[in-house]
Regions:
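Bacterial Sec-dependent N-terminal signal peptides
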Residues: 1-34
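Signature for phosphate-centric chemistry
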Residues: 30-164, 168-339, 343-440
Length: 440
């Protein structure tokens, strides 16, 4: 059953079938394809970027609003990640804590490990019932995003405009949509805003889910690298044992029977996840890794996510199909407004591969070189991909489209711009159709 929220001038009526919502009412990556040392220098110089998927949206690193001469913005097609959240996996908060507590019982813990265990236990009491929830920071990110979209492109939200929003079934995505639409309804009272959540919209929000009955099927692909993510940890960052050695007298005993990769990645997400938490909850666990170790762990996690998201290119093509179809209808109708989709990093990252955005879909010879092109920090909390459509008064003139990733201009592979930073709509449409066809 489809769930809807219809937003009037300043009224939000929520009727979500899940029955779980009561409303009480912070990346720029440089250019993809940079040389290896350049990417690693960027990450080493910026602890937020080194947090990968736990980076937060940087509102200060966006390109100024612009428009081609003789054109006016009339429509925005958007796919956005939910705002900042608590860890999506409980193990982020419990895995290391349980290891430390067990080690203390077995006299296998260092003094540093004892101190860390106490800090973690205290922190866990604050977050144990909040796993996966949107934080206040995440709510405010989406609110601010709505304000910026309206201030940059006010003509898209004038009288007679329509905004259609949909979200995945995740509560953090639904709450992100709610925050965005609530603010937009306040500042754009002439715009009709309809928000949806339901299985009918899964192809536009989270089509890679195994529960998706409409999931696209496509050709089988070979993975480009022989090395598994677990093997990559051991070959690329063998010093991870030093991290464990500061906590445990015998690290091999402490980690026996566990995935070394996930043990380290839960620690990495614990540290980076502090970026998203509110001040009264946040704790500082940055001492778990040295700066050099944290950068290494970014690259390990970067490869881990690639190993997962590579396989979503077929299913996530549904999002681009939805974007193209809805844009065609708006253009044909002469209407204005926006289509907003609220989902997850695994979809946003996959869209970048499908479109080869800034050559994100280029896979070099070895996994050690992958970070030249593929960087998780390009999908921060509240990260988003936007197509901004511009219409000319000249009869027969084709719409132009500006492509923005996290508020910065981005390039679609080697597709030529028709004017400055803008693509002709037919060129962009045909390019994306050709890319989608590769995976279907």
């Amino acid at each position: 059953m489809t769930n809807e929220m219809k937003i009037g001038k300043l009224v939000l009526r929520a009727a979500l079938a899940l029955g779980l919502i009561t409303i009480n009412v912070e990346l720029s990556a440089g250019n993809a394809g940079e040389n290896q040392s350049s990417v690693r220098e960027i990450v080493a110089a910026d602890r937020i970027k080194a947090s990968g998927l736990d980076a937060v949206y940087d509102f200060d690193a966006v390109s100024p609003a612009a428009r081609p001469k003789g054109y006016k913005p009339f429509y925005i097609s958007h796919y956005g990640r939910h705002g900042s959240r608590y860890a999506y996996a409980r193990e982020t908060y419990t895995d290391l804590l349980e290891m430390l507590q067990k080690a203390e019982q077995e006299d296998n813990i260092t003094e540093y490990g004892k101190s860390l265990s106490l800090r973690l236990a205290d922190f866990y009491e604050k977050v144990r019932y909040r796993v996966g929830d949107l934080t206040d920071k995440g709510w405010n990110q989406q609110k601010r995003m709505a304000g910026k979209m309206h201030s940059d492109y006010p003509r898209a939200f004038g009288k007679g405009s329509n905004v259609r929003a949909c979200a995945s079934g995740s509560i953090r995505s639904i709450m992100s949509m709610t925050s965005f639409c609530t603010e937009l309804s306040r500042i754009a009272p002439k715009t009709e805003i309809i928000a949806h959540q339901g299985l009918e919209y899964i192809q536009a929000t989270s089509p890679n889910l195994g529960t998706n009955p409409f999931r696209f099927k496509g050709p089988k692909f070979d993975f480009p690298y022989a090395e598994s993510d677990e093997e990559f940890l051991r070959s690329f960052f063998p010093e991870y044992v030093d991290v464990l050695g500061r906590m445990f007298k015998d690290p091999s005993k402490a980690i026996e029977g566990k995935s070394h990769l996930w043990t380290m990645d839960y620690m990495y997400m614990l540290v980076g996840g502090m970026n998203s938490l509110d001040d009264d909850v946040r704790n500082d666990f940055s001492d778990i890794f040295t700066s050099e170790e944290y950068v290494k762990m970014w690259e390990v996690d970067n490869y881990l996510r690639f190993c997962e998201y590579y396989w979503y290119r077929t299913s996530c093509s549904a999002i681009f199909v939805d974007m193209l179809d809805k844009a065609e209808k708006v253009i044909a109708s002469g209407g204005s407004g926006a289509d907003l989709r609220f989902g997850h990093d695994h979809c946003l990252m996959t869209l970048l591969m499908i479109a080869d955005l800034d050559h994100f879909g280029h896979f070099p010879e070895t996994p050690e070189e992958l970070s030249q092109y593929y960087q998780t920090y390009r999908s921060p909390m509240a990260g988003n991909l936007q197509f901004i459509f511009y219409r000319s008064r000249r009869k027969g003139a084709e719409p132009l489209v500006r492509v923005l990733l996290n508020g910065q201009d981005a390039a679609l592979g080697d597709l030529a711009h028709s004017e400055s930073i803008y693509y002709a709509w037919s060129d962009l449409r045909d390019y994306l159709r050709s890319r989608i066809a590769m995976f279907l």
